[in-house]
Amino acid sequence: MDDDNLDELVAHSPGPDGPPQVGSSELASDAEESSNGHSEDSEDDTGSEQDDDTDGEETEGLSEEEDPEDRSGSEDSEDGIEVPTAAVETQRKLEASSTPNSDDDAESCPICLNAFRDQAVGTPETCAHYFCLDCIIEWSRNANSCPVDRTIFKCICIRAQFNGKILKKIPVENTRACEDEEAEEEDPTFCEVCGRSDREDRLLLCDGCDAGYHMECLDPPLQEVPVDEWFCPECAVPGVDPTHDAAPVSDEEVSLLLADVVPTTSRLRPRVGRTRAIARTRQSERVRATVNRNRISSARRVQHVPRYLMSSLLDETIEAVATGLSTAVYQRPLTPRVPAKRKRKAGRRKKVLGRKKTRSRSSVKSKSGGTRAKKRQHRVRRTKGRKLKNEVTARSRIARTLGLRRPVRGTSMPSVYKPVDPSLGLMRADIGAASLSLFGDPYALDPFDSNGEQSADPPSPLSAKRRVLSRSALQSHQPVARPVAMGLARRQLPAVAPEPSVEEAPVPDLLGSILCGQSLLMMSSADVVIHRDGSLSAKRAAPVSLQRNSVTQSREESRLRDNLQPGALPSESVSGGLIGDRRPNSGLSCGDRTALRCLPAQIVQTPVRSDSSVTPRSGLSGNLSDESRPKWKHSNSPRLNGSNVRVGSASTKTMTHSNFPSKNIAPGHPQKTDPRRPDFSKLPRIPKIRRDGSNSTQDQAPASGQTVELPSACISRLTGREGPGQPGRGRADSEPSSRGPQETGSHTSGSRPPAPSSHGNLAPLGPSRGKGIGSSFESFRINIPGNTAHCSQLSSPGFCNTFRPVDSKVQRKENPSPLFSIKKPKQLKSEIYDPFDPTGSDSSPPSSSPESLGSGLLPSEITRTISINSPKAPAFQTVRCVTSYRVESVFGTEMDPDPQPPGEPVSGMLELLGKGPAEGASDLEQEGLGEIEPTEIQGSSARAQRPSPPDPWDDEDGVSCTPFFGSEERTVTCVTVEEPSVPSPDAPQITTHRIVEFRASSRSRSTSSSRSRKKTKKKKKVAREHQRTRSSTRSGSRDRTSRSVSPFTEEHTKRHRAKTKSRRSSSDRASSQDRAKRRKDRDREHRRGPWGHGRCWRKSRSRSGSPGSSSCERHESRRRKRRHSGSRSRGRDGSPHSSLERDRRHKHRERSRERMDKKESMTRSRERRRWRSRSPSVEHRTRRPHSREKHPHSPEKKGAVREVSPAPAPQGEPRQDGDHSTKPPVSEVSVLPEVVSVLPEVVVADLNPPEVPPVLAESVSCVPEDLDYGDSVEAGHVFEDFSNEAIFIQLDDMSSPPSPESTDSSPERDFLPNPILPPASLPQNSTLPVTQREVLPIHSEDISKPAPQPLAPSDQCLLRQDTVETTATTLSTPGVLPMGKDSPLLSGRGCEVVRPKDAVAPAPLLRSRTLVKRVTWNLQEAEASTPALDRDPRTPLQRPQRPQEGDWDAEDRALIGFQQAPFSELPPPIHVLQESGLPDADPSQPPGVPRAEGPPAVGTLHSAGGILAQVYSPNMPPPLAQPSSIPPYALVNQPSVQLILQGTLPLASCGAAQNLAPVPTMPATASELAVPTTNNSEERTATPKTAAEKTKKEEYMKKLHMQERAVEEVKLAIKPFYQKREVTKEEYKDILRKAVQKICHSKSGEINPVKVANLVKAYVDKYRHMRKHKKTEAGEEPPTQGAET
């Protein structure tokens, strides 16, 4: 009867489908044949609802057959029929009216413990206890007492839902007979005491051993059936439960029990800690088993659901589906249920070997096919049924072969299921049937033959579902079977579900797999391979990565794991390395199948260690990451390619620089990958990468490239930064970019740097650096954003790549030849490669070894550098402040990666110093140089050491230097990171400033790539610096603006910077001659430089005294600059040495651009401001337009800067004067991005007190960075990209410089008018502010120092003069300013603002800041100084420019952020204010001026002429007046800027800070912020900025907004052409500039998109035409046209 009963019950309701059975089958049968043999057949019927008609007939036959078969069949059948009929009718009603009450928390059936969902509910008539209809019916078959309270009931009330009204009452079946029969059939459970098996409702089952005990037979008889777990006397000890349970149970069951940690196997056991609703008695267990069987059989229909679908995530869904199929809706999937029934019957069949089984089979058959069912309706059906069951139809065979299963209920698509082929026990466990052991027959549910077994296997998936459905029921009631099933299913599911069971190693990482899948999906179809099984793998990475993955991935992954860990350990980014490397294997080439496989895990960890992990990925030469990683930290060479190939980089201190250390080593060397990873290295990956770009950056980094390629593409796509046309490149580039940013994260953490190094090793060297070189990545767009995670591992190269990829397009275009040799500087010098000339950039990146990573990383992820400076400053804790400053470094510097490293070790600043001249020094000098620079500068030993390439730091720094300094101009974004571990006496808390070098100008790529790209950018920067030497202030300002622009802006800026870089690349190309000249000049300078390492030194010099390199080097570089070219920085800045270059540039560009600059300076500044104001907004378009606009303006700004170039000349003179005081240095700083060099000279001059020079050096560093605003813009993009990452917060610090975007265009524009005039006076003022500003970020950690810093505020000169220490401190303080310290993370911009304030003693910092700000405003003229200022406090630069209304929005946003940060710092600013106030009035006094000018500078910035004039005369009043006019934007930003820029200048900063404090808390409008700031500024000094100024500003803002709109429209219109490469970046910028100008000057004052599109198209056609005739002409023409326009 058990079988019969079960069948009936199943049919009626007990089956998992029980209620559904009753509902579906019985309802169906009821409807069709209200009284067919519903008892047994209703189940069949239910089972085969689809065959309702046939089933109906079958049901009749079956009923007849079954009734005879099942002893209790007749009774049950009749009862069942009634019950089913009622149930069926009810079910129909239920189905019609049932609404899902599927709350797991909802009431649940005490029997099955399943929550009442939509299943029909039955309640005994005598009580209000609710049970699943099938459960209570099944229960009633055994006992007519309520399972809960044991009250006798004669009828079951059927309700549609819990608490639903009674739809019908069905009489309780006479279950006694059934029970007896069942007991006989089944191995009965006998009371251990009395030996009887009756009174099952009182026969308690031990939860431990399943032994039966009658309640009365227990020693103290139980009056109530225990609802909770009950253990027999023997199992009284819970610990024994599992054993006991296992003992009687089959081995499989035992295993299941063991698997089920919970010892109780009681099915009644509440799920999830819920107490049993009813006692676990033999009856309850029988009922539960029956219900379970029924449901399982139902579920079995669903069993074909792929096991992987059974995974936990799908559990709920499956549960819902299964529930619907089984108990939930009481609608048994007809077909599936029958098979389940069949199995169930088979199980019973074992017990009742008779017709029951046959019947079951027949029923199954009927279920199988309606037609067959009809045939089977007769006895034949019975026999046939059995056969059918075992019989394999063609369809079933095909389906089985294909793994197709009947669709899960609710789905119309057949589910694909790949049987796991588990043992019956496992299947049972999956199903949760293991608890059948309770019944004594573990195989009761598995009566089938092997065929049935197979079914069982599928059932297991279904079981999983069932389990999921009734997980509570199965788990609670049969924890043994169910939990095990769940566990097994899940365990198996992972193995089976993910078809790649082998791949399962990563452990199913849902998120990772999703991300990987997404990345694959995002990849261009060309890069994805669709396998027969439907799986996707990345084809692009496949060549290397995939190939390697396929062949060696498993092996390599394991090896990577092993290696990685070793490498990772050395790298400190074990996890990053481990996962990073292993994943880099797979994850990095996300496209790789393996990568995909690993990606899941990878991805999961990627977010955390995407920096590290991705880096290895990127350099899929995980070995490099693995082996190399441990090494490269210590040795740069290994970084190349995943192998420890020094890739010819050994000579290049920046082994990674040998992304191919030297471009010479181009692709071939990268293949030198670690012996371990010969696969990757030797893979043709590099060629592939190479094809990505003429610069075979990727080629060079075979592993890296490939990994980069795929992940880049994926990331690219995900980031959306990759141009459609450049999937491969963009991907590779993107990945590095992404890695770069991630590297930042890794670098940020002490351990991370190594990982990024490893990545840098792989991808950075290969792809990242290679990218820079090969510019094979077009993902400069994606540059830093999406791939940040991946790039992270690219660490040094990675970050370089990040920016470089931005550059890479241009590089690709212009640097087809792999200029990977470290000698790249020479190449750069001789070659006028694309502004993105990858050669320079790449050269530098390769030079920067993974150690150099820090420096290299920074470019890619501005913050990354800091973290990468792990060897020296492994303690890069957080990027406090990311300030970008433009550094003009001689390309020679690129080749000079070595010089810095020696000093680098000294400066825990790691790459910051490594970036030393360009970035490292900047960072270190800002943070470390400010603190450590004095040490380093004073103890030039660091710098002296720097020449030694071996030093890891040296390498890194050198690399930094190389990439950053390699670039002619590089916007060095100083990411201030608290770097407790920095060994710097002067900088107790050396906030490591990651100096992200964004190549200014065309090199705006991301700073991430900066290293790798920076070199590339360097070429661009060389040209740009040429441009920017003229328009350095402008460029720097622009870059700064970009950088300063809000974090979002920065992010976008990164993106845009990539674009901008492309554009700049074009303009740089246009000025390629200038650039080439400049490079040559720089190279000469560099060569002249005492250091043979033209790269680092040159960087350092280029970078204005190599502020970024290291303090010592900076000073030395400054001195050398002086020696060599009167000032290399000048040479770069257009100072003495760059005099020729500058003259050339000025002549070449100023002529064409002076007009353009003057005319467009305002327009561009407005446009840029507009863009910037937009850019601060998250709008990518806005930012992009900002960048683009910026870029188009860049040439103009460059022109303007060039105009200022004469100013730089004057500044150069001041530079010469710089020796005598800070003023000259300031002038120098102010002069240009090259001013960085100037500043170093100034510092050199100030170097007399070595400490002061450090400050200057820091300032210089800042200056270069800020100066490189073009880069800054791209840096902004980088930041933008970074914004996605934790680092981005730090980048937000840089974002404080996001203002740079605004400042960039504004200052440049504003300055353009009077840029040349103020340079001399402003530069001086600027210098101090610059220094201070740099200090701010540098000392962001040293908040405590701010108080000590008052000196600096009092007088920057003092800072330089009397306080090398103080200066260092002041610098440190500025660096430490809250901006650097807590703000950075808290609010990117706000942080920076705060840092400058707090870090710098309110007075000193603010004062410096003020100066800085003034410098910023003077940025165009005193670009060097301003960049320095901007660099440290990114906002300063931004703000200075922001004040130029165009930037106000972005500036405001940045300011708000900064202002928020400054709140805490307000008091110090006040202090500063007072101090500032004193010097403020004194325009002649550089320190005072900065203070006075800080606010005025802001104001002045708004009005170019006014600003310049004000800057000229640092009279507080005029500047303040301007701030008043500028308040909405400039003021708000300016206060922050002032806070940061005027870190030393208390007045401006203080007032700004104070006003800002309240405003910052709430993102007050720019005007609000500006107003308070203005007021403070006015308080500090007679605020010249009056209503007139404000009105003027408002008008300007209107124009700016219009310009922004115009820019947006133009960009939208030109975008397609640019994407199609119909226009070069330069042309893009020119067209953008011209079109915007034309649109803005249109009389209608309206912006008609159609007209804009036509205009743009006309321009595009014009340029195309011009290009045909003369490409160079076209390149130069844009500036001219811009000037004309």
UniProtKB/Swiss-Prot annotation:
Residues 339-364, 372-387, 1011-1031, 1054-1064, 1089-1102, 1117-1129, 1181-1191 have a biased composition (Basic residues). Residues 835-860, 1001-1010, 1292-1305 have a biased composition (Low complexity). One of its GO terms (biological process) is transcription by RNA polymerase II. Residues 606-625, 637-662, 694-709, 737-751 have a biased composition (Polar residues). The modification Phosphothreonine is found at T335, T1416. Residues 1-82, 333-390, 449-483, 537-590, 606-777, 809-860, 892-1229, 1290-1355, 1369-1390, 1421-1448, 1466-1501, 1569-1591 are annotated as: Disordered. Pfam families: PHD, SCAF11-like_C, zf-RING_2. Residues 1589-1615 form a coiled coil. A zinc finger (PHD-type) spans 188-238. A zinc finger (RING-type) spans 109-150. Residues 671-682, 1065-1075, 1130-1143, 1151-1165, 1192-1201, 1577-1591 have a biased composition (Basic and acidic residues). Keywords: Coiled coil, Metal-binding, Phosphoprotein, Zinc, Zinc-finger. One of its GO terms (molecular function) is RNA polymerase binding. Residues 41-81, 922-934 have a biased composition (Acidic residues). The modification Phosphoserine is found at residues 450, 460, 817, 848-849, 867, 870, 922, 948, 984, 1002, 1135, 1139, 1205, 1372, 1383. InterPro entries: PHRF1/Atg35 (IPR047157), SCAF11-like_C (IPR057031), Zinc_finger_PHD-type_CS (IPR019786), Znf_FYVE_PHD (IPR011011), Znf_PHD (IPR001965), Znf_PHD-finger (IPR019787), Znf_RING (IPR001841), Znf_RING/FYVE/PHD (IPR013083). Interacts with POLR2A (via the C-terminal domain). This is PHD and RING finger domain-containing protein 1. It comes from Rattus norvegicus.
